[in-house]
Amino acid sequence: MYDKNLEKEYYQICEERGYFEIDGNKTIQEKDKNFCIMMPPPNVTGVLHIGHALTFTLQDIMTRYKRMDGYKVLYQPGLDHAGIATQNVVEKQLLTQGIKKEELGREEFIEKVWEWKEQSGGKILDQMRTLGITPAWSRLRFTMDEGLVNAVKKAFVELYDKRLIVRGNYMINWCTHDGALSDIEVEYKENKGKLYHIKYFLKDSDEFLVVATTRPETFFGDTAVMVHPDDERYAKFVDKEVILPISKKAIKIIADKHVEKEFGTGVVKVTPAHDMNDYEVGLRHNLDFISVFDEKGILNEHCLEFQGLERLEAREKIVAKLESLGFIEKIEEYNNQIGYCYRCNNIVEPYISKQWFVKKEIAQESIEKVALGESKFYPNHWINSFNAWMKDLRDWCISRQLWWGHQIPVYYCECSHEWASQHTPKTCPKCQSQNFKQDEDVLDTWFSSGLWAMSTLGWGNENWGKDKIWSEKDLKDFYPNSLLITGFDILFFWVARMMFQSTNVLHQLPFKDIYLHALVKDEQGRKMSKSLGNVIDPNESIKEYSADILRFTLALLAIQGRDIKLSNDKLLQVRNFTNKIYNAKNYLLLNESKFEDLENITLHSELAKYIYAKFQTCVKDVRENLDNYRFNDAANTLYKFFWDDFCDWGIELSKAEKSSVKELGSIFKEALKLLNPFMPFISEYLYHKLSDTELKTSPSIMISKYPKFKEQDKNIEKIFSLLIESIVSIRRAKSLIDLGNSKIEKAYIKFNDKKIKDEIKAYMNFIIMLAKCEQIEFSEEKLPKAICDVSENLEIFITLENVDLSGILTRLENQKNKLEKESFKLNSMLSNEKFIANAPKEVVEQNKEALENLKIQLEKISVELQNLRG
């Protein structure tokens, strides 16, 4: 059995030799063939999860394929500083020591973060190595390294100067724990809440309007109530005033089409400082904007006696007070969608705050270029999602209230001058004063990672890292990147932002091809979660099975546009495949001690020519599938060639022609090159075993040339296909009369194409040996009193003379009776309306499928009985 412990040793040898670097395959590189793929930089706090494993596996398959195909390859690795996540980790660590970050101050806290990063961050890099991926590790980047800090400042200043980055008071998404969030950092979830109907009395009147709201704690910030202009019920109240309960402040009744007449009573409160839609209404009607709580969600002086309470805690107390004063008409159960912080799961508040924004106009050029087809999406339907999101793009809030991250390079002088600068200024450019300070906020993490496709190639780095981790010609050679592979879930977080940030600078889309894979789920299609107990940890899978087995399993399941349904059964299936090709090596080495490279021999064996023809078909299909990112089809093609064509038939047929083994071994070695991008370690191991070499003292298979397709004579495939069909058909006929593994005296073959028998005669030894027949005769007529097996191109006859059929007939009748009982039982269940209505859908489907299978089995047994009875 294959020893998976070799994987670490093999990886280390290849990394030390520099095979993963740009010129690691120098000896086979072809002119003007460049390939670049960017690793989505995982969080420095992260560990390898199954989604990473899928992304990195698919990226590495393409990287290894292109490297072996003569391309100069850059697989760019990196880590993301992960602002909020990293700051939270270090803050919690300090709190265990009784230290708050505020006690340290910003500068010392950031030093602590860097210490943590060097000691504990980046564990995921070692886990990537165990997966066998081959990025150019010497070029490892970190989104806070000095070169990328320079690039971020350059990008910011250029956008600032173009007025594409602006600062202003906006209604934003605000997390009371993590600060400002962009729209896509808010996750909306179904919420079981309440709808409060509150009486707002008209000024100087006993009449009142009933206002329906889900947020009674914000009513101190109401600056109007509104009705729909076409709602006749309330037309007479428009422009009058109502009195706010408790505070007794008078506010106006306005008419606005934003109101849904059917919602609640048709009268809604307007709180412009605490609701996205009300914010727009406030602008339209020139209303006051009154914030009723601070950045931590604590109610302020506008809330009178409730000042100092936390917003959600205050709700019940405010409602209780309103009830005691008779202002609550009724409270209803109400389901709605509420936004939560994607990071800490805190309820997000619409909040007016002065923040930095990237204007949506930045995206226009990238939208136009995508429309021209300059980037292709795989699967193609993702272009529709991309276009829809870009069409509705809003200004992007990029400032974050953190200490860890890229501090915004904007400076404020006491003379009121504001300016952006790539380099730390010594004096104010307007008044020459030294009394200025830098903006305290940092940039959204996605701003720096949005530059990844070009900043890692040296753009904006100034001279930091030049000729060590990037070179002057990198942008020319590798931009646009050839391919991006990532999960569809970060299309808008990351991919779209790289598209518009890079295009705005370089006026070219950053990627030629974009492959978006689906989610990895369990075999039932459920998301993996600890609560369901269905999480497959790639680190554990690698320990139990091997990196190769995990990689090949993921590739087999990676169908474009479909979720990957991963299970231990699938991993076991690939383990069996691994054992199959390992045993093929054992068989070959039983017959020969060493095998030549295929290019150094001439094929003489007809069997070897046939297997070589099948191999060439495999080469063609694998290349075509990889070129179109159909990873599952490429993996399936390899699986079928090794399992069916080579192991099941090549090896079996070679037992009738031992002289073919030497040539088959050379073909097997060449096929291992085809497999190498998917299963780099076992292919390396088997290749050296068959070559009688060791990786320690020989070049790796990973820098050998990837097999190229060569057209073959189809006639040899036709002949051997008929031989195999004959063997299978004879075996099937023998099994019907319980002679499965016994040698029989004679079998008759009737070919549909009568001319073919003359060509087949030269290969009769294969049929005689593998079908276990002493003699084969060709027939042009059907034989009476014979068992018959009909297949696509031929019929097989075995005479029934001297064969006792009574036991066989009894066995088949018993099988038939048993299947009929099972079929009757399932039919009854599926005819029962109560069962169909109450049973889980998947159970009903399973029963329908089982019934279909029973019908097929019954039909087959009936045909067998009919044949045996004549």
Curated annotation (Swiss-Prot):
Coiled-coil features, chain-numbered ranges: 800-870
Pfam families named among the record's database cross-references: Anticodon_1, tRNA-synt_1, Val_tRNA-synt_C
Main subcellular location of this protein, as a coarse class: cytoplasm
The keyword Flavoprotein is assigned to this record: no
GO biological process, one term: valyl-tRNA aminoacylation
Cellular localization per UniProt: Cytoplasm
Highest taxon listed in the record's lineage: Bacteria
CC per GO annotation: cytosol
Motif 'HIGH' region positions after renumbering to this chain: 42-52
First-tier enzyme category under EC: ligase
PROSITE patterns, per the entry: AA_TRNA_LIGASE_I (PS00178)
Listed GO MF terms: aminoacyl-tRNA deacylase activity; ATP binding; valine-tRNA ligase activity
Gene3D superfamilies: 2.170.220.10, HUPs, Isoleucyl-tRNA Synthetase, Domain 1, Valyl-tRNA synthetase, C-terminal domain, Valyl/Leucyl/Isoleucyl-tRNA synthetase, editing domain
Disulfide bonds: none
Function: Catalyzes the attachment of valine to tRNA(Val). As ValRS can inadvertently accommodate and process structurally similar amino acids such as threonine, to avoid such errors, it has a 'posttransfer' editing activity that hydrolyzes mischarged Thr-tRNA(Val) in a tRNA-dependent manner.
Subunit structure, as described in the record: Monomer.
Name of this protein: Valine--tRNA ligase
Organism placement in taxonomy: Bacteria, Pseudomonadati, Campylobacterota, Epsilonproteobacteria, Campylobacterales
